[in-house]
Amino acid sequence: MVEVFDKYKDLIQEGDLALIWISRDNIKPVTINANETFNTRYGSFPHKDMIGKPYGSQIAIRTKVAKKFAFVHVMQPSPELWTLSLPHRTQIVYTPDSSYIMQRLNCSPNSRVIEAGTGSGSFSHAFARSVGQLYSYEFHPVRYEQATEEFKEHGLLDKNTIITHRDVCKDGFTIKKTDETSYQFKADEEQLQIKADVIFLDLPAPWEAIPHIDSVIDNDEKVGLCCFSPCIEQVDKTLEVLEKHGWFNVEMVEIQGRQYESRRQMVRSLDDALERLSDIKKRKLAMVERRQKAEEELEKKIEANEKNLPELPPKSIEKSKFNPFGKGYRVKEGDANFQWKEVTKVESEIKSHTSYLTFAYKIKRNEDENLDKN
């Protein structure tokens, strides 16, 4: 399988592709070089400090200006982390969608998968880790070259991935010797025999590619298809063509992912509420007494014709340190002086719609038998 993304190693070595975790939404791919430094707004992290450390280690530095500590984590690449850090060439398939698609299509080490188009290569890495053979197609020449170079660096082309520059909507999926492809043809081989049992279409017009699928699928297997479509209008056209070409068990699914965060909530008892009310009452009475005293002193000064009149005290109430509700005096979450309970909180920004997933299945052998009977 894939070396960089599939074989785990303990220690960081020079030349490794590592993912620097700055924050949950900020992960950067870096090739480790002892003479280089990884720069962030929090500080600079020399690569030599990372070499020899276990993957997952926290690399900390002390900033000169603020005299505070800054840190990052060095992670080993995986398809899931790569999805969060890769350079975007197109819209990508995120892990909530890709994991569901692979489970729904029963992908396994024996699966032979067709993926069109390659795009940014996010799903390609997940497929390459889990399936037996991956045939990936990209019609855009620049994206094809970028993906080919990336797959080569990550070890995908040496294992189970073949990428081809081809417009499958017009020219179909058959890989010929004249095509620009990573597959190495033999001298007497004119075209590559593909018997796929899983099809994934991430195309603007998947309905144009569906008629070409029959020539490259396994006649003896149940073939699963998934179309990744951002617009419902694309789904409508795809459904018409799927029905026309004999696909069955058609179903459309939309994945909505939410992230739940672990939090602690202060336990509020009746005694706390009564104590807080008592605390508020004491502070108000103290404020009234101070103002009355200040007013009396002011009247005496006026009567004595003093020129420099004292200022009235501020109207704000002096904050008390007791506050079980977190108002006024700041209470830090998890403070040992208070009682807490574990709760969950949904992330504030819910991820919006990505795409519709249209699933369908086909057994070509049954089609051929029906044609023979007719």
Swiss-Prot record:
Gene name linked to the record: TRM61
Binding site for S-adenosyl-L-methionine: S120, G121, S122, E138, R143, D167, V168, D202
Keywords: Methyltransferase, Nucleus, S-adenosyl-L-methionine, Transferase, tRNA processing
Protein family (similarity comment): Belongs to the class I-like SAM-binding methyltransferase superfamily. TRM61 family.
GO biological process terms on file: tRNA methylation
GO CC field: nucleus; tRNA (m1A) methyltransferase complex
Protein's name in the database: tRNA (adenine(58)-N(1))-methyltransferase catalytic subunit TRM61
EC number: 2.1.1.220
Source organism of the structure: Candida glabrata (strain ATCC 2001 / BCRC 20586 / JCM 3761 / NBRC 0622 / NRRL Y-65 / CBS 138)
Superkingdom as given in the UniProt entry: Eukaryota
